[in-house]
C-alpha cells in the first residue's frame, strides 16, 4: 500500500498561494481475514489551490488489526481514525500555520449511525490536539476519500 511522502506534500503546499485551503480527512473500513478482523484506514489531504481552482489529493491506506467487539458501535476503530488524522496534522503543522485548514471526520452525529457513539470524544480530541474545530458528516467531504 502506498505511503504518503510528507516532504512531497509539504513542498506542494509551500508552493501554493496563501489562499490555498487544506482539508485533512480520514475513513476506515472493517473486514475479515480468516478468523480475525482488520481495518483499512484511508488518510487524505486535499489541497484546494487558491481556494477556488482545482485540487490535488494525497492519500495513504494503512491496514491494521481491528479489535472492536461491537460492529454497530465501532468506538475503537473510529477513534483510531481520529488519532491518525491528528498525527498527520502535526506532521504538516509547520506548513499549515498561516493557511485555512479544515479537519474532516467520518463521524455522523445522527444517532441512527454507529459513529455517533464517538462524536463528542472525537471533536474534543481534535480541538485539544490540533486547535481546530473539525467538520463531521454531512459537511466532512474529505473524510470520504
Which residues does each PLM region occupy?
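Hydrophobic alpha-helical segments at protein termini of multi-pass membrane proteins
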Residues: 1-4, 8, 13, 48, ...
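Basic, amphipathic N-terminal segments that precede the first structured/catalytic domain
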Residues: 1-30, 92, 97
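Short glycine-rich phosphate-binding loop at a beta-alpha junction
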Residues: 23, 98-107
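Acidic, metal-ligating active-site segments
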Residues: 24-25, 31-57
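Short acidic, S/G/P-rich loop/turn micro-motifs used as interaction or catalytic elements
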Residues: 29-32, 52, 75-76, 108-114
Amino acid at each position: 500500500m502506498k505511503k504518503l511522502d510528507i516532504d512531497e506534500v509539504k513542498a506542494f503546499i509551500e508552493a501554493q498561494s496563501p489562499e490555498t485551503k487544506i482539508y485533512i480527512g480520514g475513513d476506515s473500513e472493517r473486514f475479515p481475514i480468516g478468523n480475525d478482523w482488520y481495518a483499512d484506514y484511508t488518510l487524505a489531504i486535499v489541497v484546494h489551490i487558491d481556494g477556488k481552482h482545482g485540487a490535488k489529493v494525497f492519500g495513504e491506506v494503512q491496514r491494521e488489526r481491528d479489535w472492536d467487539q461491537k460492529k454497530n458501535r465501532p468506538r475503537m476503530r473510529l477513534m483510531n481514525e481520529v488519532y491518525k488524522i491528528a498525527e498527520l496534522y502535526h506532521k504538516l503543522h509547520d506548513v499549515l500555520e498561516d493557511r485555512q485548514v479544515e479537519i474532516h471526520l467520518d463521524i455522523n452525529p445522527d444517532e441512527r449511525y454507529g459513529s455517533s457513539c464517538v462524536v463528542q470524544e472525537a471533536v474534543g480530541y481534535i480541538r485539544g490536539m490540533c486547535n481546530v474545530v473539525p467538520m463531521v458528516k454531512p459537511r466532512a467531504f474529505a473524510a470520504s476519500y
